[in-house]
């Protein structure tokens, strides 16, 4: 039997783009202008480590400059290649357009296994990579603003920001050259949890729409829904934690590199996370059944499947066996174009990656604005809000005394109402609002157009329309 060839990640993104673009009336040539990647820079640089020079290959792709700066993460992984980086850069363009973040799309990567190097060696490598990018304006607050991705985090972003600042000593906005930095290096509260929190807000908004929930063959709210998470990294961990602790969902399956855990009664996400930190994997975790083959749990009966690791985990080889009626793409491109068609034909509802995992770039946008304004969110108005609330509470207390037993304030009302919003609360509020508005834009297309039968196509139509309007406004 001849094996079916899957399209590459880049080809999958283009196929999904083409499906949406075919339903639009774009001016001649503009469709291709939006689809193609503007530029990809490949750098090979040497770093002296352990007595010899090691050569590393890195990429930074700029997909679209309809808005500047361009924005997108930098990942560290051995599998990084030009095809992957260009696909991810394209997704960033559409993602930013969908959530109305004022950026074009970009993405970067370095071919490296971070586990093989000491911290001081990783710093040397990261600083040299940042130097190579910054001297070509591929790291710059007004040109190209990287962020963390797979294999990178706050530590790497702090090194990159410092390297840029050393090279641009008079740039007062130097901190805005990257986002995802630690709080004490110009970061913002809520950035680490942002993508996982965005997954939670996306699911909440989906379940606020009963007709959409019905399309997935479900009813009710998130409470009690059975969840399987593939990948318990930063995104998967936070999404699973918030859904189980705040929304009453039951995480019944967790899939990691060394197998999968399954417990129909629910799994303690925090306990599994601590187990992974201590032991390096999920094997031998005591409170769930371990399976060496993660595919069995991926294909198990559940209500919500959250692929939160690499691209292409749901493909033509396993799509028919996926039983979840609702998939939310926490990772970039976890469902191939072929698998997407199979799942759509089965009636599976997919909340697409370009919307679902946009929490990261949304909060990165907030961090970038914070760095450019040089002031913490809430600093100017928090105490003034508390003073105004105090006036209202004082009047309510007078009313309470006057009415006696006929009416009284709730015991915790005063404490909750008097507390002004801090930066974390403002960030979460802004993210929640962003995810709601973006979902409504997708949903409107999904419901109003007879030729659109899935959320992914709807998301692409919204994003492509916004990018095309931006290009046309510039005179293209």
Please state what every model-predicted region is.
Residues 1-194, 200-202, 206-207, 356, ...:
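N-terminal ligand-binding/catalytic initiation module
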Residues 259-350:
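Rossmann-like adenosine-cofactor binding region
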Residues 3-8, 206-207, 325-476:
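Adenosine-phosphate binding glycine-rich loop
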Residues 189-299:
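Glycine-rich phosphate/diphosphate-binding loop of Rossmann-like nucleotide-binding domains
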Residues 27-33, 100, 138-147, 171-174, ...:
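Flexible, glycine/charged-enriched surface loops at secondary-structure junctions
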Residues 54, 59, 109, 143-144, ...:
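Structural motif
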Residues 87, 171-172, 253-256, 306-307, ...:
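General beta-strand structural signal in soluble alpha/beta enzymes
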């Amino acid at each position: 039997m001849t094996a079916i060839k899957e399209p590459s990640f880049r080809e999958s993104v283009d196929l999904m783009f083409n499906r949406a673009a075919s339903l639009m009336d774009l001016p001649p040539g503009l469709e291709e202008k939006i689809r193609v990647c503007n530029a990809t820079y490949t750098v090979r640089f040497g770093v002296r480590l352990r007595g010899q020079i090691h050569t590393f290959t890195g990429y930074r792709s700029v997909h679209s400059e309809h808005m500047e700066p361009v924005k997108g993460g930098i990942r560290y992984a051995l599998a990084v290649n030009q095809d992957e980086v260009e696909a991810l850069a394209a997704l960033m363009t559409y993602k930013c357009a969908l959530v109305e973040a004022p950026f074009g799309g970009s993405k970067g990567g370095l071919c490296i296994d971070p586990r093989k190097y000491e911290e001081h060696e990783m710093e040397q490598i990261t600083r040299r990579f940042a130097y190579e990018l910054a001297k070509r304006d591929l790291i710059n607050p007004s040109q190209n603003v990287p962020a963390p991705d797979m294999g990178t985090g706050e530590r790497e972003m702090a090194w990159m920001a410092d390297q840029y600042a050393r090279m641009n000593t008079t740039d007062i906005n130097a901190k805005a050259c990257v986002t995802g930095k630690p709080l004490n290096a110009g970061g913002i509260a809520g950035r680490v949890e942002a993508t996982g929190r965005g997954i939670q807000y996306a699911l909440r908004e989906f379940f606020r729409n009963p007709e959409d929930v019905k399309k997935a063959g479900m009813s009710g709210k998130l409470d009690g829904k059975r969840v399987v998470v593939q990948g318990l990294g930063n995104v998967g961990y936070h999404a699973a934690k918030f859904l189980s602790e705040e929304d009453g969902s039951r995480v019944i399956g967790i899939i990691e590199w060394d197998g999968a855990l399954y417990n129909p009664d629910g799994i303690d996400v925090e306990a599994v996370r601590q187990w992974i930190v201590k032991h390096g994997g999920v094997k031998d975790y005591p409170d769930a059944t371990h399976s060496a083959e993660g595919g069995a749990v991926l294909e198990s009966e559940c209500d919500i499947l959250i692929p939160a690791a690499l691209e292409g985990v749901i493909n033509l080889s396993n799509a028919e066996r996926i039983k979840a009626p609702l998939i939310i793409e926490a990772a970039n491109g976890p469902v191939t174009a072929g698998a997407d068609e199979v799942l759509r034909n089965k009636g599976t509802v997919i909340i697409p990656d370009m919307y679902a995992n946009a929490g990261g770039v949304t909060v990165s946008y907030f961090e970038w604005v914070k760095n450019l304004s040089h002031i913490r969110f809430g600093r100017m108005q928090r105490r003034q809000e508390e003073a105004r609330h105090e006036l209202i509470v004082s009047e309510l207390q007078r009313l309470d005394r006057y009415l006696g037993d006929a009416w009284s304030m709730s015991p915790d009302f005063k404490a909750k109402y008097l507390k002004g919003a801090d930066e974390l609360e403002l960030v979460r509020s802004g993210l929640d609002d962003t995810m709601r508005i973006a979902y409504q834009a997708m949903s409107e297309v999904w419901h109003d157009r007879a030729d659109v039968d899935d959320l992914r196509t709807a998301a692409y139509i919204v994003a492509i329309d916004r990018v095309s309007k931006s290009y046309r406004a510039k005179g293209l």
